[in-house]
A protein has these predicted regions:
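Rossmann-fold cofactor-recognition segment
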Residues: 37-53
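Hydrophobic structural elements of the Rossmann-like NAD(P)H-binding subdomain
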Residues: 70, 126, 173-176, 186
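Catalytic loop of short-chain dehydrogenase/reductase
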Residues: 75-79, 83-99, 118-167
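C-terminal helical subdomain
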Residues: 175, 183, 187-233
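Canonical Rossmann dinucleotide-binding motif of NAD(H)/NADP(H)-dependent dehydrogenases/reductases
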Residues: 1-25
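Conserved Rossmann-fold SDR core element
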Residues: 154, 164-181, 219-223
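Conserved active-site helix of classical SDR/Rossmann-fold NAD(P)-dependent CH-OH oxidoreductases
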Residues: 17, 107-110, 150-162, 171, ...
Length: 233
C-alpha cells in the first residue's frame, strides 16, 4: 500500500516517520525536507496550485497511484494575521488566504487524482479538518476565517464523495479531526490551552493510519474523529 502525504508540518512529518518504521512506501510532499526523512521519499512542493500538483503526480505516470492520500496542509495564522476574536477583525484578504490554504488543496488534489483514476481505482483521500469547522459544534464563536474555511473544506469533501461514488465507486473520501496537537500551528496559543489537551503528533500518526486502514466504503463522505466516530457537520 503506497501513501502520499501532503504537508511537512508536525503531523505530516510524524506520518512519514511512522510509515517508514512500518516499512511502507511513501512520498512526502512539502516546502522543506524534514529532519530524519529519507530524501528519496521527499518531493518539493512550494505552492498549493494545480500546476504544482500536476508536477507531483508525474511521479505516478508510470506507476500505480497511491492507495492512501493524506492532506495535512492547513493554516490558522501567519506573520500578518491571527485568528479573529471579533467580527471587526475579519479581513477579506485573510479570509481568501484561509480558503486557499484550508479548502482548495483538497479539491486540487481530487482533480489531479480524478484525471488519473479509473472506475476500478482503490484509493482513500483523507484531509485533516477541524471541529472548529462544524456548524453543529460551534458554541464559542471567533476564528471566523479559520472556521469558515474548514466548513468549506467539509462541504467540498462531502460533495466530492457523492461524485466519486458515481465515477469511482472503489475510492473514498473522508475528513478527520485529529484533535489539538503540539505543533507550530498551536504555538501562539499554548498559554490558552491545557497542557493535557495537546497531543504529540508522533502519537497521533499511528492512530490516524490505523483508522484509515479500517475504513469501509460506506464511510466515504464522513467527518470523523480519531476513534472513527462521526462528528457533527
Amino acid at each position: 500500500m503506497g501513501y502520499l502525504i501532503l504537508g511537512c508540518g508536525g503531523l505530516g512529518t510524524a506520518l512519514a516517520h511512522e510509515l517508514s518504521a512500518r516499512g511502507e512506501e511513501l512520498v512526502l510532499a512539502g516546502r522543506q525536507l524534514p529532519k530524519g526523512v529519507d530524501p528519496a521519499c521527499y518531493f518539493p512542493l512550494q505552492e498549493v496550485d494545480a500546476l504544482s500538483f500536476d508536477a507531483l503526480f508525474t511521479l505516478y505516470d508510470t506507476a500505480a497511484l497511491p492507495s492512501v492520500v493524506i492532506n495535512t496542509i492547513g493554516l490558522l495564522h501567519d506573520i500578518n494575521f491571527m485568528p479573529e476574536r471579533r467580527v471587526e477583525e475579519v479581513n477579506p484578504r485573510w479570509l481568501c488566504d484561509s480558503l486557499l490554504a484550508n479548502a482548495w488543496p483538497h479539491l486540487a488534489l481530487a482533480a489531479c487524482l480524478s484525471r488519473r483514476m479509473t472506475p476500478d481505482t482503490r484509493l482513500w483521500l483523507c484531509t485533516l479538518s477541524d471541529l472548529a469547522g462544524s456548524l453543529g459544534a460551534n458554541e464559542t464563536g471567533s476564528r471566523y476565517s479559520y472556521r469558515m474555511s474548514k466548513a468549506a473544506l467539509n462541504m467540498g469533501a462531502k460533495t466530492l464523495a457523492h461524485e466519486w461514488r458515481e465515477r469511482f465507486p472503489a475510492a473514498g473520501v473522508i475528513t478527520v479531526h485529529p484533535g489539538l496537537m503540539d505543533t507550530p500551528m498551536n504555538q501562539p496559543f499554548l498559554h490558552e490551552l491545557a497542557t493535557e489537551t495537546l497531543q504529540d503528533p508522533a502519537l497521533v500518526a499511528p492512530r490516524l493510519l490505523d483508522l484509515l486502514n479500517q475504513l469501509s466504503p460506506a464511510q466515504s463522505g464522513s467527518f470523523l474523529d480519531l476513534q472513527g466516530q462521526p462528528l457533527p457537520w
